[in-house]
A protein has these predicted regions:
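Conserved "turn/edge" positions that cap or connect secondary-structure elements
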Residues: 1-268
């Protein structure tokens, strides 16, 4: 229903209690939201103090990021040039992100927030053996427009964001179902889904081979000696997965995926 001069309403704010976590309040939110008209999914964190870029601080954990080696050469060079972290210009950064983070959903009708998944509670050893324990919901990339690059029909780079490290969480909501990307403690990552209070279910992850998506396709790859070889997707592992905020509608989930063999000789 359309309203005349509608007022903005705060649904979840910094300082509100974190559902399912005793005596904790939200300290940070992410920009990636998914909304289906009733439910809103979002990323949130708690337990973080002021961030010290050099040492982190209470509630923050160090992560190691490496400059990309593929893609736009100006972006890659900008990543190397900006690196004054540790050994300067080696392309290896130490940044920080919240220890305690999770995926949540807010119900506009019931006016309640529910936790979908969270990172491992470091104070509870038993959680590390939980098949649905997650290490991270943030995915990092070095992106932006390098100074002096562009122009012409696209305009100057002056009004475009310069390249830097950016983090994003990925979730999509469909009624009482929430699909999300996450990284497990073993380093694998995947797309997972949860319905209400049911256990989290794995949809796809990087421990699976490509034939879970396509049992029929066989790629024809060319070797260095110009000979060709037929490679079924059962010989390739899922390498990357993509999930968009509006990709989950009418009980159907749209994703993207790439695959490669363990030596990265063949890919699709």
């Amino acid at each position: 229903r359309l309203e005349t001069n509608p007022q903005l309403k705060a649904l979840v704010t910094i300082g509100m209690p974190v559902p399912g976590v005793s005596e904790e309040k939200f300290t940070r939110f992410g920009e990636a939201l998914s909304f289906d008209g009733r439910y809103v999914s979002f990323w949130g964190a708690w337990g973080t103090g002021a961030l010290n870029p050099a040492s982190g601080g209470p509630g923050w954990k160090p992560i190691t990021l490496t400059c990309p080696t593929d893609g736009n050469q100006d972006v890659i060079q900008s990543c190397l040039d900006q690196d004054n972290n540790g050994t300067s210009n080696d392309g290896i950064y130490t940044l920080y992100e919240p220890i305690n983070q999770g995926i949540f959903v807010y119900d506009l009708v019931e006016k309640k927030t529910r936790m979908i998944a969270r990172t491992t509670d470091a104070n509870t050893i038993a959680r590390t053996n939980d098949a649905n324990t997650f290490a991270d919901f943030l995915f990092w990339s070095f992106t932006g427009a390098p100074p002096g690059v562009g122009g012409g029909d696209e305009g100057s780079t002056d009004d475009r964001e310069p390249p830097r490290w950016r983090s994003s969480a990925f979730a999509a909501v469909n009624q009482k179902n929430v699909a999300f990307k996450a990284i497990k403690s073993d380093g694998s990552n995947g797309i997972y889904v949860r319905h209400e209070n049911d256990p989290v279910t794995t949809i796809l992850d990087t421990k699976m081979t490509g034939d879970v998506l396509d049992k029929n396709t066989v790629i024809v790859a060319e070797n260095e000696d110009a000979t060709t070889v037929n490679v079924p997707l059962s010989q390739l592992y899922i390498a990357t997965l993509g999930l968009e905020r509006d990709g989950y509608r009418n009980k159907r989930l749209a994703i993207s995926a790439s695959m490669a063999d363990v030596t990265a000789t063949y890919s699709w």
